[in-house]
Amino acid sequence: MGEILDGKKLAWELGEKLGSEVDSLKEHGVSPKLCVINIGDDPASKVYVASKKRKAEKLGIKQVVYQLPADESEEDVLKLIDSLNADPEVSSLMVQLPVPPQINADRVIERIDPEKDVDCLTPANIGRLWQGKHFVEPATAAGIIALLDHYQIDLTGKNAVIVGRSNIVGKPLAALMLERNASVSILHSRSRNLADLTKQADILVCAVGKAEMIKADMVKEGAVVIDVGINRVDGHLVGDVDFAPVKEKASWITPVPGGVGPLTVEFLMEEVIKLTRRQHGLD
C-alpha cells in the first residue's frame, strides 16, 4: 500500500520560509509586488485569483488584480502589460488563463517582460527552461519536483511518464525531470497503447483533467504516482487517478485534494520572491 506524498504539509513548511524571505527583502527596502491581469468572469479564474491574493497578503507580498471586462480589447490589454513592464515597482506579472476569444493568448503572454514572467510562459523563459538556464519555473512543475525532493525520491535513471502535454504542467515538468536525469516520456490524447506505456513508469504523473482516468491496471507495482488533476464529481473533488485502487499498487501517491494543489500557490509566491531578488541584485 502506497504512502502519502503530503503536499499540504510541505506547503505549510514552505510558507513559513517564504514569510521570512519577504521580511528579509523588506529589511533591504524591497517590497515584492505581483500584478495579475484577469479578463472576464470565468468562475474558476476568479477562485484562483482570490486564492493567490489571500496567500500573497499572508506573506506580505503586495498583489494588485486588474479585473478587466470580458469584452476588453487585445490592444488595451497589451498597453496595460507595457505599462506594468515599465513600472520598476512591479516585480512579477501574470495573465490569468483562459482569456476571452477576441484576445490572442500567445500575443498577450509574449508581451510580458521575461524578467517579470512569474508563470514562465514567455518564449524566452521556455527556451531557458529547456536549456537548463532558467531563473524562474512554472509553479506546479516546481512544486512537484520539490515534493519528490522532500520525500527523497531520486529521479536519476528512472522512467518518468507524464500524461498531459500542457505548457503549464506537462512540458515544463518534463524539462525539470530531464535536469534530474530521468528518462521522460510525454503522453497525450492521441498516444497509442496508453496503458502499456503508463505501466512502464517508475514515476507516473497525470495532468489531463479527466476524472479517475488512471486505473490500477495501468500502474506498475511500486510506482510513484503524482496526480495533478482536480475534477468535481458528485459534489466531491477527485483527481485524474482512481485513488483507492491505485494506492494499493503504488509506493507513493499524492491525494486530491491535499497533494499537488496546495504547492502550486506556494511556489507561485516563491517565484515572485525569486524574481524580486533577481531584479534587485539580491539573488
Swiss-Prot record:
PROSITE patterns per record: THF_DHG_CYH_1
InterPro entries referenced in this protein's UniProt entry, alphabetically: Aminoacid_DH-like_N_sf, NAD(P)-bd_dom_sf, THF_DH/CycHdrlase, THF_DH/CycHdrlase_cat_dom, THF_DH/CycHdrlase_CS, THF_DH/CycHdrlase_NAD-bd_dom
A cellular component term, taken from the record's GO annotations: cytosol
Annotated positions binding NADP(+): 164-166, 189, 230
Domain of life: Bacteria
Pfam family, one: THF_DHG_CYH
UniProt xrefs under SUPFAM superfamilies: Aminoacid dehydrogenase-like, N-terminal domain (SSF53223), NAD(P)-binding Rossmann-fold domains (SSF51735)
Signal peptide range: none
GO molecular function, one term: methenyltetrahydrofolate cyclohydrolase activity
Catalytic function, reaction form: (6R)-5,10-methylene-5,6,7,8-tetrahydrofolate + NADP(+) = (6R)-5,10-methenyltetrahydrofolate + NADPH; (6R)-5,10-methenyltetrahydrofolate + H2O = (6R)-10-formyltetrahydrofolate + H(+)
Enzyme Commission designation: 1.5.1.5, 3.5.4.9
Keyword Zinc on entry: no
Pathway the protein contributes to: One-carbon metabolism; tetrahydrofolate interconversion
UniProtKB keywords: Amino-acid biosynthesis, Histidine biosynthesis, Hydrolase, Methionine biosynthesis, Multifunctional enzyme, NADP, One-carbon metabolism, Oxidoreductase, Purine biosynthesis
GO biological process, one term: tetrahydrofolate interconversion
Known role: Catalyzes the oxidation of 5,10-methylenetetrahydrofolate to 5,10-methenyltetrahydrofolate and then the hydrolysis of 5,10-methenyltetrahydrofolate to 10-formyltetrahydrofolate.
HAMAP family found in the cross-reference section: THF_DHG_CYH
Cited PANTHER family: C-1-TETRAHYDROFOLATE SYNTHASE, CYTOPLASMIC (PTHR48099:SF5), C-1-TETRAHYDROFOLATE SYNTHASE, CYTOPLASMIC-RELATED (PTHR48099)
Entry's family note: Belongs to the tetrahydrofolate dehydrogenase/cyclohydrolase family.
Subunit-level organization: Homodimer.
Protein name from the UniProt record: Bifunctional protein FolD
Organism phylogeny: Bacteria, Bacillati, Bacillota, Bacilli, Lactobacillales
